[in-house]
Amino acid sequence: LEAHGARERVVVGSFRDEALAPLRGRGFLLTASRPEVLRLYARVLTLRGAGTPAYQACSVTPWFHGLPVPVLQFARMLRPCGIPTHIWTVNDARQARRLWAGGVNAILSDDPGAMLGTLGRPERAGPPVESRTGRPARRLP
């Protein structure tokens, strides 16, 4: 990330705190780790607010081991802290609309074109041809 000047354009995530530990405090944008998400979940249940999170994004799934995750409550709780909520993996347009309307900032999908269509945006072109041939792809703005 540093070699490509991408430190401020990429959010690094891991379920494990120990994987993110070497990056903390070094200017990298990080997602909440699993223990941080569990602490946030406890704060939702006890109505205590988000506190002062040490991460710059919260990336969660709507279901974890068959249990619903309160993603809309996470989004409402984190928005005043300036922390976006990303949800994965959502492929259903109705669910995506409900999540966006509820304050979720981003959706990771197996079908990004369908998600863009749900937002009323045209599908973007695929990756540049040169990236499929093994030659370096052009840099995007």
Where are these regions (language model features)?
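Short loop-to-alpha-helix "cap/lid" segments that border enzyme active sites
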Residues: L1-N105, S109-P141
